[in-house]
Amino acid sequence: MNIEKADYGTIIRFGTMQDLNTKLQMEGKTLDEVIDVTDKEGVSLLEESLIARKFDIAKVLLANNAKVNNISHEGCNEFHFIASNINQDGALDIAKILLDRGTSLMVKDKKYGNSAFFTLCQEIFKVRSVEGLNFLETCFESVQEYDTCNKAGYSIRMLINERGTDKLKQMMESRT
């Protein structure tokens, strides 16, 4: 990769933190100056790091106060982007930071109408790790609505009733 020609998102996606630091030095910029840059699709550098499973970079960006709740042109926020990698080492640590920072679980993507929480549930239910299921239980406290259907006609309630744990079902029923 030609660091000189590559944009910051490309460097994050295909490079290392060292490559990003090299690019910043070459341009005479600081991380604070570019931390919230988005690409033509509205995807932030933090989101690029989540897509690429560069959780070490995500941790640095979050430690330097990268903006959360960035919504891409497709309607996705950070939880949508980390969801497909949520079962990878280090992903839940980042997801917990995102939750603590107030990243919305209810933002819906434009393509499917899936909330960030729905998307996380889909992926965590595939592996069903204790840590992942515990994270969903923690998230559930911030879920305001679970009966609205996505474009395929499925709701969070339906997903939890079909594939969720008994504890998630109990949590949901205790709120109705």
Residue spans for each PLM region:
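Conserved binding-pocket/active-site segment within a compact domain
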Residues: 106, 112-145
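Conserved ankyrin/ankyrin-like repeat signature
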Residues: 19, 56-57, 90, 94, ...
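Ankyrin-repeat boundary/"N-cap" motif
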Residues: 2-10, 33-48, 71-84, 108-123, ...
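Helix-turn-helix repeat elements of alpha-solenoid scaffolds
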Residues: 14-21
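Ankyrin repeat domain, specifically the short helix-to-loop turn at the C-terminus of the second helix
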Residues: 24-34, 59-67, 96-105, 134-146, ...
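Leucine-rich solenoid repeat scaffolds
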Residues: 145-176
